[in-house]
Amino acid sequence: MPEFVSPFSGLAHERKLTPEELIRAIRFMIAAEYEAIQLYMQLADSTDNQLAIDVLKDIADEERVHAGEFLRLLRELDPEEETFYAEGAEEVEEEIKKSKKA
């Protein structure tokens, strides 16, 4: 689980990131975006104030865009990442086919 105390949690400050560290940091940022989406949507679901609901949902949508940007960057930095996503998608496709036959 990401630790949000510091944006550089676990990272060295006195040098540039290695490619592997950058990839890990991008994964951390993706997790942070998804956590932010969850928090904004929970708050929106917890109020009757329509203005707050609208603003929170809009911000959550912006976080989804950020997650997409980070995911695209991750795929560029680590092309092998896409093979894992494709494998996972194929596994779900197989389950979908099974459930439609049942």
Language-model-derived ranges and their functions:
Residues M1-A102:
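Iron-associated oxidoreductase/ferritin-like identity signal
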